[in-house]
Amino acid sequence: LTVRSTAGITLAHGAVFAGFPGGKLVAMSLFNGNLGWEVTVSQPRGVTELERMTDVTSSPVVNNQFVCAVAYQGRVACFAINDGTQIWAREASSSAGLTMDNDYVYVTEEKGIVAAYDLLSGAGMWKQSRLGSKKLSSPIIRGQYIVVGDDQGYVNLLRNYDGVLVARSAT
C-alpha cells in the first residue's frame, strides 16, 4: 500500500532529490544519474500494512545546506545536502507537505495542524491547531506569512514567527 499524494522531485545544486514509499529519500546526480546518497526519513512501524505506511508524501525542500522531507505516519527530517547526514528528525505525519525559509521548516500535519520547526535544531517552535480537522494544502511562504488552503475553500494566513492565524478568506 502507498499513500495517494503529490510527491515529486526537486532539482537543485546539480542533483535530483526524490522521496519514495517506505520513507526513503535519495539524492542522484543530475548529470550522470549516479546515486549520491540514500537515507531513511521514517522507518515503517506497526503490524498491519496500513500502520506501516511511511511514504514520503511531497517534494523535498532544499536550501544551500539542507534537504528536508516529511513522511506520512512518520517524521519530518533534515539532512546535509552534500552527504545525507541526518541533522535532525521529529515525529510528524503529513500527506500534504512542507516548505522552509531561512529559519524554519513549516509542515502541514494531519488533523488540520500547521507546525514550525527550527531549521538548524529541529526544535518545535509553534503549532497552529485552530484550523480544526480540515484537510490542508501544502504550506506556501509569502513574505512574513505561511499560506495554507483547506478543503472548505478557505485560504488561511498564519504569521511565520508564531503561527497566529491572522486572516481567513473564502475563495
Regions found by a protein language model. Name each.
Residues 1-13, 38-62, 87-101, 125-143, ...:
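Extracytoplasmic beta-rich repeat domains
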Residues 20-21, 64, 71-72, 109-110, ...:
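Structural signature of WD-repeat beta-propellers
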Residues 29-33, 80-83, 118-121, 159-163:
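Short loop/turn segments that connect beta-strands within beta-propeller blades
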Residues 102-108:
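Conserved mixed alpha/beta catalytic, RNA-binding, or beta-rich assembly cores of soluble enzyme
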Residues 121, 145, 150-171:
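C-terminal closing repeat unit and adjoining cap/tail of repeat-based domains
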